[in-house]
C-alpha cells in the first residue's frame, strides 16, 4: 500500500521521510462509566453480598401501582399534575404516568412471590420538578424490599448499617430519625456524618399493613428497606 502511495508536495514528502511504520500504535482513549452508574452498581453489589436479588421495574406505570397499592390517598399532593408527569394513555382501566419512585415494584413483587424475599430495584424516576442545583425532573432511586417471617425493625437497621459501611467506610457514623412515608409504618430517614455535618441518604421503614393487605402476604411477615 505504501509503495503505491503518491505524495503531492515536498512538505508531505518531508513528513513521510520521518514516518516510522514500526512504531507501536497509540492507545485509543476509552470512555468511562458515569458516576451515577458507578454508585448504583456499588450499592447493588453491597446488597447482593447480603443475599438480595436485583430487579428492574417499568418506567411507565399505572396509577394503581404507583399510588393506590402503596397506601397513598386520593387527595395526596403527589397525585397532582404539578408533581406527577401524567401520560396521555388513559384507557378504561388505567391512568398511566412516569413513575415517581421505584416503590411500585413493591406491590408487583409481593403479588408474584412468596417469602422469603430479598430484592433491590434500581431505576430512573420522574417528577415535575423545577431544575436547580439539587432537583431535576429525572433522577435515580434504589428500592429495597425484604419479606420473611418474624423479621424486625432492628434487622432493617442492621441491613442499612452494613450497606452504609460498605459504601462509605467501616467506621462510618449513621443516625436514624422518625419520618413519614405513606407506605411504611414506622418510617425513618437515615443520615451519615460527612465532613462534620449530617447528610440524609435514604428513607426506610416497615411496610405498611395496608400496602401488604392488597397482596396475598400477611402483614407480620414484611419489612421494607
Language-model regions, residue ranges each:
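TRNA-recognition modules of translation machinery and tRNA-sensing kinases, especially anticodon-binding
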Residues: 1-218, 223
